[in-house]
Design a protein with these regions (language model features):
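Conserved AAA+ ATPase "SRH/arginine-finger" region at the nucleotide-binding site
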Residues: 182, 198-211, 218-230
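Interdomain "pre-motor" coupling segment immediately N-terminal to P-loop NTPase/helicase cores
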Residues: 2-49
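Conserved catalytic/switch belt of AAA+ P-loop NTPases
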Residues: 109-110, 137, 153-200
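AAA+/P-loop NTPase substrate/partner-engagement loops
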Residues: 107-142, 150-154
């Protein structure tokens, strides 16, 4: 082989490598290593293993007992092979929506039920139909989860979500369920819905397509602002769980002042106070 031929083949190889890096092949379901959780990496077209899931125990989520029972019952039915609904957890930020999804997954796995959690980021939602199809080829159950799911004006990716939830003529895979959290009950701002009404050939059909997106979820689970006593119950449950020494601290007064300073009472604000309290009392809360 001449030097020119060698250089030509080398150049072709580099071009092929570059094309593959930009357009990686679809993953092989059989090659997916076992794990409790994965995150979809769109750039690499593969599932990335999650070694340590960032979650709290289910019993620490106070003030959302009804929401907890509803989603837990639905999840257990799904994992056991019975009929179950896709779920939309909607409401104010910091009220425990995503924490509940992760805590319930942890609960069912500790009970010996084999189920993996797969997170797909909001910006990758167009890959949801492919992910559903990919997971359908595996002999395992999966909760596919997207946090903070909303669609703004001009964003047409919601159509991919509708297609995935409807499942086409094949239907939704029996071994996959989809949970999403959002601060919008209908996933879209009112202005976007009104804009579709004004530009549609048949205004009622345009609005119906937008609003009906949330109808693809069989469960709508609302999360609302909590009162003062519930907020304090959340704080005290963390204090007890982490065994924080509060002998020199008036936690009720401090926690309320913390919430006033941040202008909100929520599970997230309660946790932020606990992190601050643990630091001041030199309590390790990272390994619990």
């Amino acid at each position: 082989m001449s030097d020119n031929d060698s250089r030509f083949l080398h150049t072709l190889g580099r071009i092929a490598d570059a094309l593959e890096s930009r357009n990686p092949p679809d993953p092989d379901p059989a090659a997916l290593p076992p794990a409790d959780a994965y995150v979809w990496n769109r750039a690499r077209r593969r599932m990335m293993l999650v070694e340590n899931i960032n979650r709290v125990e289910l019993r620490l989520l106070c003030g959302i007992e009804q929401q907890r029972d509803t989603l837990l019952s639905n999840t257990i039915a799904f994992v056991r092979g019975f009929a179950a609904n896709n779920a939309l957890l909607w409401g104010a930020r910091g009220t425990g929506k995503s924490s509940l999804v992760k805590a319930i997954h942890g609960t069912v796995t500790t009970r010996g039920m084999d189920c993996a959690l797969v997170e797909i980021h909001r910006e990758d939602i167009e890959d949801l139909p492919f992910i559903m199809s990919f997971l359908a080829g595996l002999d395992r159950r999966f909760i596919v989860f997207t946090d903070d799911l909303t669609f703004d004006h001009g964003d047409s990716s919601y159509k991919s979500l509708k297609a995935a939830l409807d499942g086409g003529i094949e239907g939704r895979p029996d071994n996959v369920i989809f949970y999403a959290t959002s601060n919008r009950r209908h996933l879209m701002p009112r202005q976007m819905i009104e804009n579709e009404r004004s530009t549609a050939i048949n205004p009622s059909e345009g609005v119906e397509e937008s609003v009906s997106l949330s109808d693809r979820f069989g469960l709508w689970i609302g999360f609302h602002s909590i009162d003062q006593e519930t907020f304090l119950d959340i704080v005290e449950s963390y204090v007890t769980f982490f065994d924080i020494d509060t002998s020199k601290v008036d936690i009720r007064r401090e926690a309320l002042a913390w919430s006033v300073e941040r202008g909100a009472r929520s599970g997230r604000v309660a946790w932020q106070y606990i992190v601050d309290l643990a630091e001041r009392t030199e309590t390790n809360i990272s390994n619990k």
